[in-house]
């Protein structure tokens, strides 16, 4: 009985503690600092000195005709750097501005209550100004500035960048429906946000939004097929079906022109967008959940949208399908889980239900430190907050070294880091980009969730209910590419430079920062333990709902790749590779992996805790050096989202270089060679030279007893 009484007292204390923390939380201060993070990521000629340690940067960024702005700087010099790097990726930047615009529209009164209206609108405008500048002609848009591989191979503040920064354009011949529609969405949302305070600017935003919508809708194509440099960082995993709907919804909201809504309704049905939302995150790649939510409000007479949104939200609630950490974070994937939970929390706040509001409250509480470890995931705020996020400017190395100085020189206050592992484990380690990268899209959903909690009893702005014609007034010019129901989200945003330290993600030199920002089902992720200084920024790993393609054979071996991925393993690589190469195939196989080592890229095949090294003692694979051989590569084992052991392939081959035009079997012991035990998440094979090497081929990757 005494034990029972103590348990009851502990439960009551826990509930009271939560209530007190909620009551005492200054959401206005959190919101202000979350917005100030964007000032820390500004590029171009800065209009103020609000962040004294940031200066002018990327002043020569321009469209291919070297156009200048009013200050004589490149016309694309402004905008936001994506994450902890110096690249301007058009898709996540536009997505971030759409999300900020959306939260402003929904929670304008809460924002005003905090006295943050001016800061909020300034934050949006700094991004939308760049989107307008990037829209250089009716059917032309600058989708990216900066070479991700080159940028990620250097570690230092953006003010010191000297590398070439190419601009990648989208045109009618090189279309990019995702970016065109996302930029249209951002500018349409901005036109609503600025309508009362700056009607002239609002009109400019809307004019560009209409033209961009027409560009994306008429000239269809996957943007990362046109801007191939983006594939290792922000590949379009979901295709553009969701973007067609998303863009049309926002144009309808801004114009009340029913033609846009008719398109949205038709494309939602034909593209299977409701299905794309289920079991997934709302993020820069997949806007399907947001489409369900907005259409449920715009077309309340059609139950499909409400049903689809409720299905999505229920998945995120306890017991609904998404993994929950022991401390209570809704954890959908290992790359930057905090960002997904924060964005889901924002959408939950708009559900108009008690369970949605409760979900929002609990997720934000966890992120700001109300969790068993009393660990905040917001830099500079809450208990035990991070101080070493993966961010070049805040770290401020002058020696191209991710480890020097030991601690970041400047506090990136208000930035949401990637977040914990599935068991709430977390280490404040700059080189661990999976847990410690920050990015504009990470904060975008977080800002919205915070704005909702300033006054949780406030309701979002109601939307007009239109009359919808079920048949589109314009038939799509092309059937959008197919989208998986599960979409990876991102790939690295950065690549290490050269001096490795430990778990680089992309280009060694130091320790990588983060190769993808997320780990896609197909590209991104992490980087070596040795050279890289950083890896890509956003590789997203897809929601783990894949059906295994092969069952391991009675404990003797576990196939990872055999003419294709096996047993739930996914492609989280960053770098130039193919999983379906047929030009150099081992006898008895139909495909091999081709990999062109350069810029510290890697082939990363992962599956969370799928290899139990107590059962499978070794990792084996066959490798062919192709036309030249002698490639300098390293194999790294990943556990709990971190590299835990690494060996040069040459060393595993008895000191013999990789042989040209011949298949060689490589075998390594998890315990003896990598000093690792327990369950691990996979392996990556990475370039350690930096310069481009000849293509290598890999086959038959298995874990053996």
From Swiss-Prot:
Biased-composition ranges, Low complexity, are 462-552
Q: Where do glycans attach?
A: 75
Q: What does this protein do?
A: May digest the spore cell wall during germination, to release the enclosed amoeba.
The Gene Ontology biological process terms listed for this entry are: cellulose catabolic process; spore germination; sporulation resulting in formation of a cellular spore
Q: Which residues form the signal peptide?
A: 1-23
Q: Care to name a GO molecular-function term for this sequence?
A: cellulose binding
* Keyword Glycoprotein annotated: yes
Residues at the active site: 85 (nucleophile), 390, 428, 437
Supply the alphabetized keyword list: Carbohydrate metabolism, Cellulose degradation, Glycoprotein, Glycosidase, Hydrolase, Polysaccharide degradation, Repeat, Signal, Sporulation
The protein, known as: Endoglucanase
Q: Which domain of life is it from?
A: Eukaryota
**Which organism encodes this protein?**
Dictyostelium discoideum (Social amoeba)
Chain intervals for the UniProt region annotation (Pro/Thr repeats ('hinge') (Pro/Thr box)): 463-552
